[in-house]
Structures are given as C-alpha cells and as structure tokens.
C-alpha cells in the first residue's frame, strides 16, 4: 500500500511542470478551422463506386494482341521448315551436277565482288556480332602479305625526335686554379701568376703551404700591383718606416700606444684615382679620427679636410680605432677630454707627412685604442658626444659602426634612450620615409606622434606636405591633424577658420 501511495504521489495528478510557462512553435499549435464555401458537399463514395461500370476493354485488347503475335511466329517457323525441306530435296536430286553449278556460281560471285577490307568484320552480321568466330588462314596470310598503303605526302621522319645539339657537346670541367691564374696574368702581370704558381700545392709532394700564408701573400701582391682596387678594408701598418699592409681578416694583436708610436697611418685606398702608378700607401684618404706623428705627439689640425671624407668610401663610414679587436690583456684608462687637446678635426699622418714637430709635445698616458671614439664632423655633435656617459658613448659607437652618422644617432638616442634595437628601428623608419621624398623635420614629427602605425605616419606626412604647400604654418597643421585624427576635411576647415580669424 505504501508503494502504491508513493507511486500515486509521484505519478498522479501532481507534476513538477505545472504552472511553468512554455513557448511552443507554430507547427505545434492546432490548425485554424477552414470554412467551406456555401453549397459545397462531398459526394458519397460508395454510391459513386456502385454507379461505375468497368468493361475491361483494355485487358481484352492486350490478350488479343499477344495471341496474334504467337500466330505470326508459328507461321514463320512453318515457312522456314518448308524452305529447308525443299532445299534438301533439290540437293538430293541434283547430285554432283548441282554441286558443280553451285561452286561455279559461288566462284563467279566472289570474282565479281571486290575482296572485303577486313574479312573478319565483313563476315560478321548484326545478330551474331558477339559470337566468337574462327580466323581463317587465308585471311591472316592476306593481312600479312598486303603492303601498307602509304600516302605520298606523308613522311614518318617528320614525327621522329630531332637530334639535340647539346648531345654532341663535350662537357669539360673547369679548373678553378687555372682560370684564376689566367685572370691574374691578364690583370696584374706575370709576377702575380708566378706567385700563384709557387703557392699552389704540388701533387705528390710534401711541401704544401698553409692557407694563411697563401692568403697573406695574395693580399700583399694584390695591394702592390692593383692600386685601383676598390676599398677592401686593408689597413696600412708601417713599422718604423717600412710599410707593411695587413688584412683585417688576419688576426693581428696591436700593443697599447706607447710614447713613441709605431703606427703612422690608418688609411684606406681611394675609390677613384687617375694615376695607376702610385702606391696604396700614398692613396690614403684623410678622415676624422685620432692620429699621431712619428714621435708619438698628437697634432691638432684646425684646417678642414679637403680630401674625401669617410662617408665617401663606398658609402661606408670610416672604421675608427675602436673597430680593431685588441688582444691586449691589460685594461688601460680612458683618455678624457681634459687630458686631450680640443680634437675638433684630426687629420691622419701619411708616409709623406711633415718632419716631427720641434715644439713642446704632449705625451698622453697609455689608453686602450677601443676607447677612442670616431670624431663626428659637426662640432655640436662632438660636444654632445663628450657630454655622454661611457655607456651612452659605447651605444653611439655601436650604431655608428653600422653606417649611421653621429648626428642621426644622437638625435635618435635622445628620443629612444640607450636601447640599440629601438634606435635602429627609429633610424630605419626615418631613412625609409626620407627616401620617399618627405621632409626630415616632418618625418621626425610623424615618428614622434605615430610611433606604432606606419599607415597613420604615411597619412600624416601626406597631409602635412599638402597643407604646407597650401601655405599653412607647420604648428597649426600639427595641432589640427592631432585634434581631428588625420581627418582631411575637418582639418582643412579648422585651418581655414584659423587663417580667417588671424
């Protein structure tokens, strides 16, 4: 009883879904009632069926048609049987005479009719095309012996592969050393070729020179006999009057600069020269950097450099002494601005420099060459460089050695700090926009306002250039574009209103 009561409690009239509203779709709603037109009434189906009288005329016609087809087929069979019996009787009566007549008629018919093109297909009929047939030996012989019918205007050779002219070409391997020797003979004379022949390793001999010696000899010979070669990074390091040219690639350790310096010049060959007989040491271009005389004294040159500057050397900035990797293990104190004379423009000593100065000399203390910065050409940039801290100066030197000028690097460092990546990004974007023809001042304004969006920078520069050509002031243009977010129409209206008010 208890179980029945529990079941009645849960499954009786009570439900958890009572008084819960539900939204049902249109397809679950009861359809609306449709009213029939006045006077419409359905006929009684039973009465209609009773009144219909079916005569089965179509079925009767179908049966009659089938019986007629059977009669026609039986008549055809009887006619075929009669014809076969008549032929059998004629053959039995005629005997050998009939056979000869039949064979004569067959040969006559075959002689008059032309032979079929394909006897196998000609023997097939439409009703027996799927039945297998035996191939007669005469047909195969006729097919084999019959010559192919070739048209006069058809040439099979036209469709054959033509000979490739490269098939008969003899491939030869290139002897790189032989080609190099021929090139050097034509450009630098027989001495270079003789040097190369002496340095080439002989087969089967134990006297094989090392790669470094060969490279060093080639570099020395190239500098001696090719003075018009492009700047290739060779540094003239004369040792007490004897100029010895060494490559940056060779590992050279430079000692600290003593009171009497052995370094007389740090130079690069010129890019262009008319006199091909001059030595490479005489073609040293003057650049702005620290230099010393033969007796170790520093010279303050107040005259501007008349020769080509460092930026003219193939588009690269001149490498200062800081570019050289020193192997010296001792750390030398840096030369401060108080210990150095005012080095506004320093010229490099060449081999044909003036005699040693007889006046009082200043002997600086020993310092690391890597701590001497490249001097900027602008005095203002030089003064700003002297005011920087050692870390900031190192950052500037790092970016300048990549090919940028001191002025641009100092300007970028003021805005981006000592982060080299941000400085390089700023300089790269600045250079790209300047190459597109925009004013450098406008480019700096755009980079300052829109640092992250290249599209907005381009739009800002185009509008700035357009409004500047119209005659508006740059200050007003900048304020208006910043206020209206580069909206051309609103900015132009604002500029016109300001111009009218003024």
From Swiss-Prot:
Residues 86-117 are annotated as: Disordered. The modification Phosphoserine is found at residues 146, 205, 289. It comes from the Eukaryota. Signal peptide: none annotated. Residues 102-112 have a biased composition (Polar residues). Residues 1-95 are annotated as: Interaction with ESCRT-I. Its main location: cytoplasm. Residues 86-100 have a biased composition (Basic and acidic residues). Keywords: Cytoplasm, Disease variant, Endosome, Hereditary spastic paraplegia, Neurodegeneration, Phosphoprotein, Protein transport, Repeat, Transport. Residues 260-290 are annotated as: Interaction with PTPN23. Coiled coil: none annotated. InterPro entries: UBA, UBA-like_sf, UBAP-1-like_UBA2, UBAP1, UBAP1_C, UMA. It is found in: Cytoplasm, Cytosol; Endosome. PANTHER family: LD44032P, UBIQUITIN-ASSOCIATED PROTEIN 1. The UMA domain mediates association with the ESCRT-I complex. Component of the ESCRT-I complex, a regulator of vesicular trafficking process. Binds to ubiquitinated cargo proteins and is required for the sorting of endocytic ubiquitinated cargos into multivesicular bodies (MVBs). Plays a role in the proteasomal degradation of ubiquitinated cell-surface proteins, such as EGFR and BST2. This is Ubiquitin-associated protein 1. It comes from Homo sapiens.
